[in-house]
């Protein structure tokens, strides 16, 4: 099969590796020095269980693995799967305009999972939810998708680019839980799950909205508190105040599932324990903050804020923590600009 991975970050590289290792043709789209290094010397990937190295490989370009910087250089290829693995700030209309020609009428598309998606209310079951079935709160993105072709996949790995060309998967938690959003893609979703299981984890899931919600609220809660406290996972696990803040954010967010009668498939304590089991991990936004890079917290909060307005729900403590952290980030950026 032909697989396009649009975004050669740490997760995108691991997905590319999983697809290539199971005999599929992979087109990996990257940029910058990371792309240059991979193009020259191949993609070096290490897969660990915290401190234990499980697997290590260098994947170089060949007739089954293409490392590219410009998607427009791909000619006459029909893709079975398209993974969109760019950062949320880059998941925009410009990116989708580039991708659109490669998302055919039968191409399964796996968009980012961290932010509550534009299709959140589509095909939502339950009589009480009928009034929400046509709600679209992100029309700039949704117009590029065939909704029936979407496969939702969440990503539960601690993964990082250690330096250009070198990716380390520090810990695999649940791997890649996935499910079709519409019945049309069931066979494609089942096939994709079987492929992932050959090299990673990909559990069966009953309710994909519950999965993606938990991933999104996890990301928002842990990244917000990590940025506020400037703690890695080990430090968060040892600090009761931090864990209490995480609990409060998750509890507020769970109102969304309750109102829509979506099952809460994992309780809050299990979510906290699962995430903090990656003791060597530092939350991605804290890593970016320390490096002076732009963080994505505003994208996450935008998704929750949009849904809360539609459902008339308050996330007062979450909003307070979000604004507190963004003030901190903006103050640091202003200081950096003055010192340039």
Region roles according to the model:
Residues 102, 143-156, 163-215, 220-264:
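Internal alpha-helical scaffold of NAD(P)-dependent oxidoreductase catalytic cores
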Residues 1-53:
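NAD(P)+-binding Rossmann beta1-loop-alpha1 motif at the extreme N-terminus of oxidoreductases
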Residues 56-163:
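Rossmann-like NAD(P)(H) cofactor-binding subdomain of soluble oxidoreductases
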Residues 1, 80, 174:
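Nucleotide donor/acceptor-binding cores
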Residues 103, 117-127, 168-177, 230-236, ...:
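Helix-loop-beta segment of a Rossmann-like dinucleotide-binding subdomain
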Residues 4, 27, 108-110, 151, ...:
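A structural signal for isolated positions on well-ordered beta-strands in alpha/beta enzyme cores
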Residues 244-340:
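NAD(P)-dependent Rossmann-like dehydrogenase/reductase catalytic/cofactor-binding core
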Residues 29, 48, 68-71, 153-155, ...:
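Conserved beta-strand termini and adjacent loop/short-helix elements that scaffold enzyme active sites
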């Amino acid at each position: 099969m032909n697989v396009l991975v649009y975004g050669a970050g740490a997760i995108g590289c691991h997905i590319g590796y999983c697809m290539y290792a199971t005999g599929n043709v992979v087109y990996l789209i990257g940029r910058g020095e990371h792309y240059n290094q991979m193009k020259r010397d191949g993609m070096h990937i290490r897969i660990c269980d915290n401190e234990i190295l499980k697997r290590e490989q260098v994947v170089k370009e060949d007739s089954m693995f293409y490392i590219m910087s410009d998607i427009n250089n791909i000619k006459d290829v029909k893709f079975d799967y398209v993974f969109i693995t760019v950062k949320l700030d880059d998941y925009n209309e410009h990116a989708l305009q580039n991708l659109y020609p490669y998302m055919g009428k039968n191409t399964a598309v796996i968009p980012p999972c961290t932010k509550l998606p534009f299709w959140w209310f589509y095909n939502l079951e339950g009589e009480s939810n009928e009034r929400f079935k046509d709600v679209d709160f992100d029309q700039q993105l949704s117009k590029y998708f065939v909704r029936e072709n979407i496969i939702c996949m969440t990503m539960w790995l601690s993964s990082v680019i250690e330096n250009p060309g070198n990716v380390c998967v520090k810990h695999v938690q649940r791997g890649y839980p996935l499910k079709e959003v519409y019945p049309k893609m069931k066979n494609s979703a089942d096939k994709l799950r079987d492929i992932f299981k050959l090299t990673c984890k990909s559990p069966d899931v009953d309710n994909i909205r519950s999965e993606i919600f938990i991933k999104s609220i996890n990301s928002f809660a842990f990244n917000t508190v990590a940025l506020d406290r400037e703690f890695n996972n080990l430090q968060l696990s040892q600090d009761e105040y931090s864990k209490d803040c995480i609990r409060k954010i998750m509890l507020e967010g769970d109102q969304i599932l309750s109102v829509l009668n979506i099952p809460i498939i994992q309780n809050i304590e299990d979510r906290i324990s699962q995430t903090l089991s990656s003791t060597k991990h530092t939350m991605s936004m804290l890593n970016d903050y320390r490096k002076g890079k732009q963080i994505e917290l505003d994208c996450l909060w935008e998704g929750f804020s949009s849904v809360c307005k539609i459902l008339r729900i308050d996330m007062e403590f979450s909003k307070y923590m979000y604004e507190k952290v963004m003030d901190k980030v903006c103050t640091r950026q202003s200081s950096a600009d003055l010192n340039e």
